[in-house]
Curated annotation (Swiss-Prot):
Gene name of this polypeptide: glsA
InterPro entries assigned: Beta-lactam/transpept-like (IPR012338), Glutaminase (IPR015868)
Pfam families, sorted: Glutaminase (PF04960)
Gene Ontology MF terms: glutaminase activity
Organism for this UniProt entry: Shewanella amazonensis (strain ATCC BAA-1098 / SB2B)
Top EC class of this enzyme: hydrolase
Summary of subunit composition and partner proteins: Homotetramer.
Protein name: Glutaminase
UniProt-listed Gene3D superfamilies: DD-peptidase/beta-lactamase superfamily
NCBIfam families reported for this sequence: Gln_ase (TIGR03814), PRK00971.1-1 (NF002132), PRK00971.1-2 (NF002133)
Record keywords, A-Z: Hydrolase
Record field: catalytic activity: L-glutamine + H2O = L-glutamate + NH4(+)
Biological process per Gene Ontology, one example term: glutamate biosynthetic process
């Protein structure tokens, strides 16, 4: 059974790892974050949230936003419309690879690498008059926190360093798999990545993935079938090139971001968010992964 004392104990056990790994520095706004932060929050499907460490401090969620984007697309499109434009397979290349996009004729491997997330952002742009505002509404609804907001400094910083993502988008456009103005989609995409949320916010927002698509306020966000498929994609492709290692050590569907956050799901039971900014070689939170590994061991839970 999950108790406050367990979370406190796990955070204490993992603290000695702080200082190992490296904070993401290719986005200047992220490079300024202390590597000594560590937090965890767990929300059960009945709405109870427990946390320890820096669990209420907001951070840049970065690629964790790709879960919200894909969920938003599933709310707007038939699945065949999505999966005709993006694949469902692990990548095996870096998350911002141009080579793979070229070799596979503009169809990204999955929605959680940059190319795939840009296609999803393009889909949202096609159906929404104000995609940035709609995304904010979705995230605020899911997290039950109407103060969640974009970090303009982070969004602007990413836009100023957007050459590679722009190249990916234009390459996909050359293959006919990008329909809107590249600059407009990039601005929306960087805003999604700049969402500032705490472990508490994210653990609450992701409850629908643990509860057959039903959010904390009782609304069906996506169907039970769509939820299973989302979790399957998270299990195979949610942790960059570290997805196999994460499945082996933690055994939960998950999604990481270079801001140091990781969300993980125990279907039918709970959603978890950990945060520690220093990353391992795969770009995943080093201390955060260990924290989730210990939690899985203590609870005796895995999807496998």
């Amino acid at each position: 059974m999950l108790e406050q004392a367990l979370l406190d104990d796990l955070v204490a056990k993992v603290r000695p790892l702080l200082g190992q790994g490296k904070v993401a520095d290719y986005i200047p706004a992220l490079a300024r974050v202390s590597p000594y932060k560590l937090g965890i929050a767990v929300t059960t499907i009945d709405g109870t949230t427990l946390g320890a460490g820096d669990w209420q401090e907001a951070f840049s969620i970065q690629s964790i936003s790709k879960v919200f984007s894909l969920t938003g697309a599933m709310m707007l499109y038939e699945e065949r419309e999505i999966w005709s434009r993006v694949g469902k397979e692990p990548s095996g290349h870096s998350f911002n690879s141009l080579v793979q996009v070229e070799l596979e004729r503009g169809i990204p491997r999955n929605p959680f690498i940059n190319a795939g997330a840009l296609v999803i952002a393009d889909l949202l742009q096609s159906r929404l008059g104000a995609p940035k505002q709609r995304m904010l509404e979705i995230v605020r609804m899911l997290s039950q926190n109407h103060k969640v907001c974009y970090d303009k400094v982070v969004a602007d910083s990413e836009y100023q360093h957007s050459a590679r993502n722009a190249a990916i988008a234009f390459l996909m456009k050359s293959f006919g798999n990008f329909h809107n103005d590249v600059d407009k989609v990039l601005r929306s995409y960087f805003h999604y990545c700049s969402l500032s949320m705490s472990c508490a916010d994210l653990s609450r927002a992701m409850v629908y993935l643990a509860n057959q698509g039903v959010s904390l306020d009782g609304n069906e966000v996506v169907s039970p079938t769509q939820t299973r498929r989302l979790n399957a994609l998270l299990a195979t492709s949610g942790l960059y090139d570290g997805a196999g290692e994460f499945a082996y050590r933690v055994g939960m569907p998950g999604k990481s971001g270079v801001g140091g956050g990781i969300i993980a799901v125990i279907p039918g039971d709970m959603s978890v968010c950990v945060w520690s900014p220093a990353l391992d070689a795969s770009g995943n939170s080093l201390a955060g992964t260990r924290l989730l590994e210990l939690l899985a061991q203590e609870l005796g839970r895995s999807i496998f």
